[in-house]
Amino acid sequence: MSFDFMTPNKTKNSTVGNYAIVETSGTQFWLEADRYYDIDRINANVDETVTLDKVLLINDQKGFAIGKPYIKGASVQLKVMAHKRGPKIIVYKMRPKKKTRTKNGHRQELTRVMVTSISNGEKPKKATTSAKPNTKKPSTAVKSSKVEKTPE
Protein backbone atom coordinates (compact mmCIF):
# COMPACT_ATOMS: atom_id res chain seq x y z
CA MET A 1 0.00 0.00 0.00
CA SER A 2 1.47 3.34 -1.05
CA PHE A 3 0.72 6.70 0.50
CA ASP A 4 1.73 8.89 -2.44
CA PHE A 5 -1.25 11.17 -1.91
CA MET A 6 0.36 12.45 1.31
CA THR A 7 3.23 14.14 -0.53
CA PRO A 8 1.68 16.37 -3.19
CA ASN A 9 3.77 17.94 -5.97
CA LYS A 10 6.66 15.56 -5.30
CA THR A 11 7.67 12.71 -7.54
CA LYS A 12 8.99 9.50 -6.06
CA ASN A 13 12.53 10.12 -7.29
CA SER A 14 12.71 13.84 -6.52
CA THR A 15 15.09 15.00 -3.84
CA VAL A 16 14.24 17.92 -1.63
CA GLY A 17 17.04 20.42 -1.09
CA ASN A 18 17.32 22.95 1.68
CA TYR A 19 14.03 23.83 3.31
CA ALA A 20 12.72 25.45 6.45
CA ILE A 21 9.45 25.38 8.32
CA VAL A 22 8.58 28.86 9.57
CA GLU A 23 5.68 30.41 11.41
CA THR A 24 4.07 33.60 10.18
CA SER A 25 0.63 35.08 10.85
CA GLY A 26 -0.37 32.09 12.96
CA THR A 27 0.31 29.43 10.33
CA GLN A 28 3.31 27.27 9.52
CA PHE A 29 4.81 27.16 6.03
CA TRP A 30 7.29 24.78 4.38
CA LEU A 31 9.64 27.12 2.46
CA GLU A 32 12.34 26.20 -0.05
CA ALA A 33 14.92 28.61 -1.47
CA ASP A 34 14.27 30.30 -4.84
CA ARG A 35 10.52 29.54 -4.83
CA TYR A 36 7.41 31.71 -4.78
CA TYR A 37 4.74 31.49 -2.09
CA ASP A 38 1.45 33.27 -1.39
CA ILE A 39 1.11 34.04 2.31
CA ASP A 40 -1.16 36.33 4.32
CA ARG A 41 -0.67 40.05 3.77
CA ILE A 42 2.64 41.40 5.10
CA ASN A 43 3.02 45.08 5.91
CA ALA A 44 5.92 45.71 3.51
CA ASN A 45 6.35 47.43 0.16
CA VAL A 46 7.04 45.65 -3.12
CA ASP A 47 10.74 44.73 -3.65
CA GLU A 48 11.46 45.01 0.09
CA THR A 49 13.29 42.26 1.95
CA VAL A 50 11.53 40.74 4.95
CA THR A 51 13.19 38.51 7.56
CA LEU A 52 11.26 35.75 9.32
CA ASP A 53 12.84 34.78 12.66
CA LYS A 54 10.32 32.19 13.86
CA VAL A 55 12.03 29.18 12.30
CA LEU A 56 10.83 25.83 13.63
CA LEU A 57 12.95 23.44 11.54
CA ILE A 58 15.80 23.65 9.02
CA ASN A 59 17.06 20.89 6.75
CA ASP A 60 20.35 21.56 4.95
CA GLN A 61 23.42 19.62 3.85
CA LYS A 62 24.52 19.16 7.47
CA GLY A 63 21.23 17.63 8.56
CA PHE A 64 18.20 18.67 10.58
CA ALA A 65 18.01 21.44 13.15
CA ILE A 66 14.86 21.45 15.27
CA GLY A 67 13.97 24.32 17.58
CA LYS A 68 12.39 24.27 21.03
CA PRO A 69 10.13 25.90 19.82
CA TYR A 70 12.29 28.15 17.58
CA ILE A 71 15.90 27.89 16.39
CA LYS A 72 18.01 30.67 17.89
CA GLY A 73 19.69 32.85 15.28
CA ALA A 74 17.99 31.17 12.32
CA SER A 75 16.21 33.29 9.74
CA VAL A 76 14.60 33.16 6.33
CA GLN A 77 14.97 36.09 3.92
CA LEU A 78 11.92 36.86 1.75
CA LYS A 79 11.58 39.33 -1.10
CA VAL A 80 8.09 40.82 -1.54
CA MET A 81 7.08 40.41 -5.19
CA ALA A 82 3.45 41.63 -5.20
CA HIS A 83 0.33 42.20 -3.14
CA LYS A 84 -2.82 40.55 -4.43
CA ARG A 85 -6.18 39.12 -3.43
CA GLY A 86 -7.23 35.50 -3.37
CA PRO A 87 -10.28 34.01 -5.07
CA LYS A 88 -13.72 35.09 -3.91
CA ILE A 89 -15.38 32.72 -1.47
CA ILE A 90 -19.17 32.92 -1.28
CA VAL A 91 -20.88 32.53 2.10
CA TYR A 92 -24.61 31.85 1.74
CA LYS A 93 -26.89 31.51 4.75
CA MET A 94 -30.55 30.58 4.53
CA ARG A 95 -33.29 29.79 7.00
CA PRO A 96 -35.92 27.65 5.33
CA LYS A 97 -39.58 28.79 5.42
CA LYS A 98 -38.59 32.16 6.92
CA LYS A 99 -37.58 34.10 3.75
CA THR A 100 -34.23 34.88 5.38
CA ARG A 101 -31.27 34.77 3.03
CA THR A 102 -27.84 36.41 3.24
CA LYS A 103 -25.10 36.19 0.65
CA ASN A 104 -21.63 37.48 1.45
CA GLY A 105 -18.34 37.27 -0.39
CA HIS A 106 -14.79 37.32 0.95
CA ARG A 107 -11.41 37.75 -0.77
CA GLN A 108 -8.30 37.13 1.33
CA GLU A 109 -5.49 39.69 1.11
CA LEU A 110 -2.26 37.90 0.08
CA THR A 111 1.39 38.73 -0.48
CA ARG A 112 3.48 36.89 -3.06
CA VAL A 113 7.02 36.40 -1.73
CA MET A 114 10.14 34.71 -3.02
CA VAL A 115 12.50 32.98 -0.60
CA THR A 116 15.99 34.35 -1.23
CA SER A 117 17.96 32.60 1.51
CA ILE A 118 17.67 30.27 4.48
CA SER A 119 20.29 30.60 7.22
CA ASN A 120 20.60 28.57 10.40
CA GLY A 121 22.41 31.27 12.36
CA GLU A 122 25.82 29.62 12.45
CA LYS A 123 28.75 31.89 11.77
CA PRO A 124 31.19 30.63 9.15
CA LYS A 125 34.43 29.39 10.67
CA LYS A 126 37.51 31.45 9.91
CA ALA A 127 40.32 29.57 8.25
CA THR A 128 43.54 29.67 10.26
CA THR A 129 46.70 30.07 8.21
CA SER A 130 49.19 28.79 10.75
CA ALA A 131 48.96 26.79 13.92
CA LYS A 132 50.23 28.61 16.98
CA PRO A 133 52.70 26.64 19.07
CA ASN A 134 51.98 26.11 22.75
CA THR A 135 53.82 28.98 24.46
CA LYS A 136 52.41 28.42 27.96
CA LYS A 137 54.95 27.55 30.61
CA PRO A 138 54.12 24.66 32.89
CA SER A 139 53.12 25.79 36.36
CA THR A 140 55.58 25.25 39.18
CA ALA A 141 53.00 25.18 41.95
CA VAL A 142 53.49 22.39 44.45
CA LYS A 143 50.47 20.67 45.88
CA SER A 144 50.36 20.56 49.63
CA SER A 145 49.13 17.42 51.29
CA LYS A 146 48.62 19.09 54.68
CA VAL A 147 45.17 20.33 55.60
CA GLU A 148 44.82 23.06 58.21
CA LYS A 149 42.11 22.60 60.77
CA THR A 150 40.23 25.54 62.18
CA PRO A 151 39.72 25.65 65.96
CA GLU A 152 36.20 24.99 67.10
From Swiss-Prot:
Domain of life of the native organism: Bacteria
The keyword Metal-binding appears for this protein: no
Any single biological process term in GO: translation
Signal peptide segment: none
This protein's record includes keyword Iron-sulfur: no
InterPro entries linked to this entry: bL21-like, bL21-like_sf, Ribosomal_bL21, Ribosomal_bL21_CS
Pfam families assigned: Ribosomal_L21p
Keywords: Ribonucleoprotein, Ribosomal protein, RNA-binding, rRNA-binding
GO molecular function terms listed in the Swiss-Prot or TrEMBL record: rRNA binding; structural constituent of ribosome
GO cellular component, one term: cytoplasm
Compositionally biased intervals (Polar residues): 127-143
Region annotated Disordered, chain positions: 115-152
Quaternary organization: Part of the 50S ribosomal subunit. Contacts protein L20.
Family in the record: Belongs to the bacterial ribosomal protein bL21 family.
Functional note: This protein binds to 23S rRNA in the presence of protein L20.
Name by which UniProt lists this protein: Large ribosomal subunit protein bL21
Organism: Prochlorococcus marinus (strain SARG / CCMP1375 / SS120)
